Amino acid sequence: MSFVKRLVQLDVDSTFIQQEAIELLAAKAGVLKEVSKITDAAMRGELDFAQSLLARVELLKGLPEAVFDQVRDEITLTDGASDLVKLLHSQGHVVSLVSGGFVNIMQPIVDELKIDYFKANTLEIVDGLLTGQVLGSIVDRAAKAQALTEFALDAQVDMENTVAIGDGANDLDMMALAGL
């Protein structure tokens, strides 16, 4: 039996990590209740993700950039997540993370775990404060599916040898596109 390289792509919030990063940020801003209502509706597919993300991020306006380190300290990887990445890498597979969450929080974790590919939203910062805006294109349902295709192509993995793992409406397209 010959080796078949696979790409395993995981959602981040409440899948690879146990928390929702936006809710950790919202708690620091004192707007957790408002943000949680919007998050829940978006995860159920009742609200367009991009619109809901922009509404939630707007509520974070004025938070200091230092909040990212504080939130990162509160993040707990899902049990077995780090071991899974190490195992997949040791077997020659490729690991990617995609998130409707934020590069600002996850990048050090991605670097530490040597994740092969990563795509998430970037919160805008001006003069050390969050502006309440997202830079660039929003990582939504379609962007997660597109990332799977792009990462597989770059890693030279056939789509039939991709795996996608997620927990919400935002993950359905990438899961449908994956080979498993």
Predicted ranges, named:
Residues 1-123:
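Alpha-helical substrate-recognition element adjacent to the catalytic core
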Residues 72-180:
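C-terminal cap/substrate-recognition subdomain and adjoining C-terminal extension
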